[in-house]
C-alpha cells in the first residue's frame, strides 16, 4: 500500500467510510477536501457485476458529458482526400495517414483521441499493439471509426468521453474538474451513469451496479449511493 501524505490523511478523516453519499453531497465533499495546488480532475470509479473475460459481458462505449471534462483533448484523425480536409476544417489537431502511422510506430503519442475513416483501419490496425493498451484504438463502438469525421471531432471537443470496463470489472472515467460547480458535476455524473446502465450487457448476471466511488486526483474516495441509481 502506498503511503499517503498528511493532507490526504486529514481529508480522509472527514469521509464517513460506512456511508453511501447522495451525488450532490459527495461532490460537495470532493470540492471541500481538494488540497492540491492544481485544478484536480474529478474521477468516478464504477464497479460492475460483469466478468470482462467473457465477450458477452464487455462494457464499452462513449457519451457526451453536458459540461465537458474541463480538459482540452488533442484529436488525431486518420483520413485522406476530402475527409482529411473535412477533419482539418472541423478543428482536428493532427490529420494524415501513413506519415502518422510511421510517427506513432517510432514512439510519438502526443494526442488524446484517435478517429479514423473505415478505409484507413487496415493500415491503422498495424498500430494495435501500441494504441490498444493505451485505450486509443479507434472503434465503431465509441464512434471513432466513421466517415462522419466532422461530427466525431465536434463531439470529442464538446466533452465526449469513452468508457471501458477493465480486467477487474471497474470503469474509470473523468467527469470534470474540482473548479466545476456541484450542479455541473452532478449532471455529468448522471449522464455517465445513464449511459452505463443502458450499456448493461445481455450476459451480465445478478447485480449490475456493485459500487460507485468518486474522488479528486489526489483526494480520498467517497462512496455514492449506487442503489438509488438503478431505476
Curated annotation (Swiss-Prot):
PROSITE patterns: RIBOSOMAL_L1
Coiled-coil spans in chain: none
Keywords linked to the UniProt accession: Repressor, Ribonucleoprotein, Ribosomal protein, RNA-binding, rRNA-binding, Translation regulation, tRNA-binding
GO molecular function, one term: rRNA binding
Keyword rRNA-binding: yes
GO BP term (any one): regulation of translation
Pfam families given in the database record: Ribosomal_L1 (PF00687)
Cellular-component GO terms for this entry: large ribosomal subunit
Residues in the signal sequence: none
CDD domains: Ribosomal_L1 (cd00403)
Function, in words: Binds directly to 23S rRNA. The L1 stalk is quite mobile in the ribosome, and is involved in E site tRNA release.
Quaternary organization: Part of the 50S ribosomal subunit.
Family statement: Belongs to the universal ribosomal protein uL1 family.
UniProt protein name: Large ribosomal subunit protein uL1
Source organism per UniProt: Carboxydothermus hydrogenoformans (strain ATCC BAA-161 / DSM 6008 / Z-2901)
Amino acid at each position: 500500500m502506498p503511503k499517503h501524505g498528511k493532507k490526504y490523511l486529514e481529508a480522509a478523516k472527514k469521509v464517513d467510510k460506512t456511508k453511501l453519499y447522495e451525488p450532490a453531497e459527495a461532490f460537495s465533499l470532493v470540492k471541500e477536501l481538494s488540497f492540491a495546488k492544481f485544478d484536480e480532475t474529478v474521477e468516478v470509479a464504477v464497479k460492475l457485476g460483469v466478468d470482462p473475460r467473457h465477450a458477452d459481458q464487455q462494457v464499452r462505449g462513449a457519451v457526451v458529458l453536458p459540461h465537458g471534462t474541463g480538459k482540452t483533448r488533442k484529436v488525431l484523425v486518420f483520413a485522406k482526400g476530402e475527409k482529411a480536409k473535412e477533419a482539418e476544417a472541423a478543428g482536428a489537431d493532427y490529420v494524415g495517414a501513413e506519415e502518422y502511422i510511421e510517427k506513432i510506430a517510432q514512439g510519438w503519442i502526443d494526442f488524446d483521441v484517435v478517429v479514423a475513416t473505415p478505409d484507413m483501419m487496415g493500415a491503422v490496425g498495424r498500430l494495435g499493439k501500441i494504441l490498444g493498451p493505451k485505450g486509443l484504438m479507434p472503434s465503431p463502438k465509441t464512434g471513432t471509426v466513421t466517415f462522419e469525421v466532422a461530427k466525431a471531432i465536434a463531439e470529442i471537443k464538446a466533452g465526449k468521453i469513452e468508457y471501458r470496463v477493465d480486467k477487474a470489472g471497474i470503469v474509470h472515467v473523468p467527469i470534470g474538474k474540482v473548479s466545476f460547480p456541484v450542479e455541473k458535476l452532478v449532471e455529468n455524473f448522471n449522464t455517465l451513469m445513464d449511459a452505463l446502465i443502458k450499456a448493461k450487457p445481455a450476459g451480465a448476471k445478478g447485480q449490475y451496479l456493485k459500487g460507485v466511488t468518486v474522488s479528486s486526483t489526489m483526494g480520498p474516495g467517497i462512496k455514492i449511493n449506487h442503489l438509488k441509481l438503478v431505476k
